[in-house]
């Protein structure tokens, strides 16, 4: 588990990364670095480096955000998000609790899940 003060996070994250990862913001669709990337590798938490998703589970969802049908087992945690007037499932890094995005039940086989992730929350470690 990685625990830092908000001041420590502000020292290592850009203002936009801090807004998304620590304050649960959302980057505009089709603007993030990885929404249309096909590079093979492992997508890790931008804040702490914890591996979150493998590139072989990434798919084109048409939403404008990187989307994956499976996380690396036990590396992504889920919480209920009741903000904005509806209930969604928020996803966070299981190591530092950084906000990643949300998971939805409209993804492809084999899981039927769509992990919709902010590019600012990710760092791709290419193979």
What does each model-identified segment do?
Residues 1-2, 6, 10-127:
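A short Gly-Trp-Pro
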């Amino acid at each position: 588990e990685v625990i830092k003060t908000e001041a420590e996070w502000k020292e290592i994250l850009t203002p936009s990364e801090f807004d998304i990862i620590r304050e649960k913001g959302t980057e505009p669709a089709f603007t993030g670095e990885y929404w249309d990337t096909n590079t093979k590798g492992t997508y890790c938490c931008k804040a702490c480096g914890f591996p979150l998703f493998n590139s072989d589970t990434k798919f084109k969802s048409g939403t404008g955000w990187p989307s994956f049908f499976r996380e690396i087992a036990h590396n992504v945690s889920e919480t209920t998000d009741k903000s904005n007037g509806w209930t969604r499932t928020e996803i966070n890094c299981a190591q530092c609790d950084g906000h990643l995005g949300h998971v939805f039940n409209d993804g492809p086989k084999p899981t039927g899940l769509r992990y919709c992730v902010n590019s600012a929350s990710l760092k791709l470690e290419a193979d």
